[in-house]
């Protein structure tokens, strides 16, 4: 399975990416980058680190919300998930990133 990394400019003029699964659902989102090359480096870091389970920081935020961060080898967060209603659904989200990120294509979108 491969997903799609969408590169876009946010309202503040920063470059961001989101990883979408085959069904079109966003499964990982980035922080803002000042330039496109930094954003593309972030995409490459996600592709490289996604298969490694040790790179995932599993978190529980209040009110039974679960999420995860994907970290690079330098411990920097390179992607953040949405909030999930259960630990099991969060773990499925991690598996989805592992399956979709390594071979995902990169496209630029308008927003």
Swiss-Prot record:
Family classification: Belongs to the UPF0339 family. Duplicated subfamily.
UniProt protein name: UPF0339 protein in ptx operon 5'region
Database matches in InterPro entries: DUF1508, UPF0339_domain, YegP-like_sf
Pfam family, one: DUF1508
Sequence repeats: 10-58, 61-109
SUPFAM superfamilies in the cross-refs: YegP-like
Keywords, alphabetical: Repeat
Native source species: Stutzerimonas stutzeri
């Amino acid at each position: 399975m491969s997903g799609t990394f969408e590169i876009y400019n946010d309202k503040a003029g920063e470059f961001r990416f989101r990883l979408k699964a085959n069904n079109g659902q966003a499964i990982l989102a980035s922080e803002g980058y000042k330039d496109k090359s930094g954003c593309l480096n972030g995409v490459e870091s996600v592709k490289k680190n996604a298969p490694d389970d040790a790179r995932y920081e599993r978190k529980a935020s209040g009110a039974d919300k679960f999420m995860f961060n994907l970290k690079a080898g330098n411990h920097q967060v390179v992607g953040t998930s949405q909030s999930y209603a259960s630990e099991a659904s969060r773990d499925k989200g991690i598996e989805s990133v592992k399956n979709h990120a390594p071979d995902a294509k990169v496209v630029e979108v308008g927003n």
